[in-house]
Amino acid sequence: MPVCLLVSEDNSHKPIELHHQQSVTLGRGPDTKIKDKKCSREQVELRADCNRGFVTVKQLGVNPTLVDDVVVGKGNQVSIKPGQSLYMVNQQYPYSVKFTEDTSRSKPSKRAQQIQSPTKTTADVSDSPPPPKKTTPPAGEKSESAGHWSQGLKASMQDPKMQVYKDDSVVVIKDKYPKARYHWLVLPWQSISSLKALRSEHVELLKHMQRVADQMVEQCPDAHKLSFRLGYHAIPSMSHVHLHVISQDFDSPCLKNKKHWNSFTTDYFVESQDVISMLEHDGKVQVKEGAGELLKLPLRCHVCGKEQTTIPKLKDHLKTHLPS
């Protein structure tokens, strides 16, 4: 049976061996050489499926663990395969996984806090990729990345009921949980996981995405009385690059918490033109360090800057700025 190795991409330590269906808890400590106190001592739980060639990553720590710039989220889990990158915390300390038939050549380090996998409960089966030939995935579960919600865009962009525009390069869909009266997503058909994966060769594609977004705004029946912004989340919650086209009324029942609000009204929301400019000048997109902390900022009105203590109070205040 193949053996899985967790490999530090910055070569800070020897590969860590992950045995088949055995849980390994990792974080700050001697095994990873991580000393950053923002990384919990028990930041992630990893479980390798050596037969099927993936590793399940469950975030245990408070600060974000990412897979290809997609936040896992505390208590959530996703799958990682060879070719993807796992960032232990806050887009730092990158790892990849490797499956090999003979571990004697690699001499991996001692496994950290390894625990023999207990018998799966019903909850375990619903939350993680099923073991081979034993459990049927729950109804409606998607095969890619164990059907995790972060992969939902890839299904939505193929759904004719969700599409409002498409051409050979892009598709526009309605956001499933709109945070304003008008909220669309422009997605390329080309598979691009995140802002971090963008390069200078993608400039023309992103310019086309922006032109399509501008057309959506121009065709909106309320464009004469509502303002719009076009941009990307610094650390997206969904896999696959997508450009938000969102009206600035934020009049929606789906806007429910501080993270929702701050993701569209702080520097966490990166303007489309700024992303294009970074690619033209630097050949890549630089996400500011600590961008995730912006989601914790106080609630402030995006129009007048007045601070509000709760989402309901913020929504009441926003009504004073709505066009008549």
Swiss-Prot record:
Active site: 242
GO-annotated biological processes: single strand break repair
Source organism, top-level taxon: Eukaryota
Compartment annotation: Nucleus, Nucleoplasm; Nucleus, Nucleolus
Catalytic activity line of the entry: a 5'-end adenosine-5'-diphospho-5'-2'-deoxyribonucleoside-DNA + H2O = a 5'-end 5'-phospho-2'-deoxyribonucleoside-DNA + AMP + 2 H(+); a 5'-end adenosine-5'-diphospho-5'-ribonucleoside-2'-deoxyribonucleotide-DNA + H2O = a 5'-end 5'-phospho-ribonucleoside-2'-deoxyribonucleotide-DNA + AMP + 2 H(+); a 3'-end 2'-deoxyribonucleotide-3'-diphospho-5'-guanosine-DNA + H2O = a 3'-end 2'-deoxyribonucleotide 3'-phosphate-DNA + GMP + 2 H(+)
Region (Interaction with DNA substrate): 175-179, 237-238
Domain HIT: 150-255
Biased composition regions of type Polar residues, renumbered to the chain: 111-125
Enzyme Commission number(s) from the entry: 3.6.1.71, 3.6.1.72
Gene Ontology MF term list: DNA 5'-adenosine monophosphate hydrolase activity; DNA-3'-diphospho-5'-guanosine diphosphatase; double-stranded RNA binding; mismatched DNA binding; single-strand break-containing DNA binding; single-stranded DNA binding; zinc ion binding
Annotated FHA-like domain residues: 23-72
InterPro entries: FHA_2, FHA_APTX, Histidine_triad_CS, HIT-like, HIT-like_sf, SMAD_FHA_dom_sf, Znf-C2HE, Znf_C2H2_type
Enzyme class (EC, first level): hydrolase
Keyword Membrane attributed: no
GO terms under cellular component: nucleolus; nucleoplasm; nucleus
Region (Disordered): 100-160
UniProt keyword annotation of Membrane present: no
Alphabetical UniProt keywords: DNA damage, DNA repair, DNA-binding, Hydrolase, Metal-binding, Nucleus, Zinc, Zinc-finger
Motif Histidine triad motif positions after renumbering to this chain: 240-244
Zinc finger (C2H2-type): 299-321
Site feature (Interaction with DNA substrate) residues: 156, 233, 244, 259
Role of this protein: DNA-binding protein involved in single-strand DNA break repair, double-strand DNA break repair and base excision repair. Resolves abortive DNA ligation intermediates formed either at base excision sites, or when DNA ligases attempt to repair non-ligatable breaks induced by reactive oxygen species. Catalyzes the release of adenylate groups covalently linked to 5'-phosphate termini, resulting in the production of 5'-phosphate termini that can be efficiently rejoined.
Record remark on domains: The histidine triad, also called HIT motif, forms part of the binding loop for the alpha-phosphate of purine mononucleotide. The HIT domain is required for enzymatic activity.
Protein name: Aprataxin
Species name: Danio rerio
Gene that encodes the chain: aptx
